[in-house]
Amino acid sequence: MFLFYVNPILIAAAVIPAIVLLRFVYKEDRLDKESPGLLLSLVIFGILSTFAAIVTEQIGEAILGILLPQSSTAYNALLYFVVVALSEEGFKYLLLKKRTWYSGEFNCQFDGVVYAVFVSLGFALWENLGYVAMYGLSTALVRAVTAVPGHACFGVFMGVYYGRAKRYDNDGDFVKAKRCRTMAVLMPALLHGAYDFIATMEDPNCEWMFLVFVLALFAVSLKLVRVGSRSD
């Protein structure tokens, strides 16, 4: 309901970064483009995954607060790598697989990247609306070049492994398919956890570490998209 009380400029600032990235990935799908209905449903599934993640994160954070002091490194590591990252990437993956694994449109390996990025950006879009509604335009500008493309990058890594899993499954290599499906959750969760963990460290030197990490994440993700789109 908060959307009805947010300035249209703020809504645009929150939504446009995700739309730009969605369009970019869609254009990179050069072979047998996916139907608009499927892609829209993936964005909606990404939005739905935020609600499941919120509940899981609240429960996980409460349990973690009982077990460890909040000021400890162990608390922060478990919070960001397990409670937050694994919850968010896990629910994205579950809804991604539910919607696309048996879809007749899933006929190219790069489709896995397209699907995962659309789910991830659905998540990022909805999350971004909440942050911008609470904190304003300055937050929108920062997140437009950090958190939103960050979610897209996590989606790229998820999609790379998800697409490989589908290829192996089609070839009858179910062991490798299962291994890739596992990596489709673990790899983006690891990157997501590292992103959050480094971003929240209080050491001033970590600002440079975060910048290097983000630039490397963006560069590798872009390379994976470029190579993947030309490999089918």
Regions found by a protein language model. Give the residues of each.
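Hydrophobic alpha-helical segments at protein termini of multi-pass membrane proteins
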Residues: 1-232
